[in-house]
Amino acid sequence: MSENFQHKTVLLDEAVAGLNLRSDGIYIDGTFGRGGHSRLILSQLGAEGRLIAIDRDPQAIAAAAQIDDPRFSIIHGPFSALADYVQEMGLSSRIDGILLDLGVSSPQLDDPERGFSFMRDGPLDMRMDPSRGLSAAQWLMQAEEDDIAWVLKTFGEERFAKRIARAIVERNRTEPLSRTRELAALISDASPFKEKHKHPATRSFQAIRIYINSELDEIERALEGALVALAPQGRLSVISFHSLEDRLVKRFIRQYSRGPQVPKGLPLTEAQLQAQGGPQLKALGKRMPGEREVVDNPRARSSVLRVAERIAR
């Protein structure tokens, strides 16, 4: 049985403020976690307001069951299916705001039974939803050396990806890796250079977790789904925690904030330009955590909040 691990919500007030809440609006918390953002949103909604939360983690669903509020509902599933959920509910283009708090939550990191962290020993799992897909141990056991190296390099920007991948494959031939501390020790031994103030396994654990959970694909699909869901002037508020996530969010907002990409000098009338489709989002800027929040919650250090608004078409 896992302990009741606490979660400090990062950029709580800023992310919710980015939604520009209306008391009677319909909102989505795409990453319920332990409900920090959801509870703040509910506290600012009126009797006619509505909040729909989403999470694929069974422990998050259990936490959501503790919220006894007729304005609140929870969907057990990936946020990548956001467009499907709103279409099934007849809410396409009717959502007034969507909040996404990306990455792994503190309770997931701190619970050794989930296998996300090497700080405490646990089974080498790393799945957001333990009932679906391969665990990290299962994938590492069957993956080719080149595939492991590609994952470590692509999703962890690990400079010693090939050396670490070779060590993993060689170890699995004799004694399969099954524990987080085993993998962390192996990575440390395989790394010829140690970064100051950073465990050698940090990048590899991030990379494997992202791959196991298809995190970047999930984010991309969720962002595309937001365009289907949001009403005109609806807000998108997204918190990311590492450069790969933030780069993806930044690129998405920039892409949909541009008008039609027409070659210079092409003779088109105003009506023809309109037919090409105008921008769909307006970027409203980004926020970083303040010094006090970083001191209170060191995990907030790398977080970035980006906010955008849906443009009527």
Swiss-Prot record:
Alphabetical keyword list: Cytoplasm, Methyltransferase, rRNA processing, S-adenosyl-L-methionine, Transferase
Coarse class of the primary localization is cytoplasm
Q: Where in the cell is it found?
A: Cytoplasm
Q: Entry's InterPro entries?
A: RsmH, SAM-dep_MeTrfase_MraW_recog, SAM-dependent_MTases_sf
Recorded E.C. number(s)?
2.1.1.199
Record GO terms (molecular function): rRNA (cytosine-N4-)-methyltransferase activity
Pfam families in UniProt: Methyltransf_5 (PF01795)
Residues annotated as binding S-adenosyl-L-methionine: G35, G36, H37, D55, F79, D101, Q108
Instruction: Return the SUPFAM superfamilies for the record.
Output: Putative methyltransferase TM0872, insert domain (SSF81799), S-adenosyl-L-methionine-dependent methyltransferases (SSF53335)
Task: Share an example GO biological-process annotation for this protein.
Answer: rRNA base methylation
Q: Which PANTHER family match?
A: 12S RRNA N4-METHYLCYTIDINE METHYLTRANSFERASE, S-ADENOSYL-METHYLTRANSFERASE MRAW
The record's comment on protein family reads: Belongs to the methyltransferase superfamily. RsmH family.
User: What task does this protein carry out?
Assistant: Specifically methylates the N4 position of cytidine in position 1402 (C1402) of 16S rRNA.
Name of the protein: Ribosomal RNA small subunit methyltransferase H
Q: Which organism is it from?
A: Edwardsiella ictaluri (strain 93-146)
Gene it is expressed from: rsmH
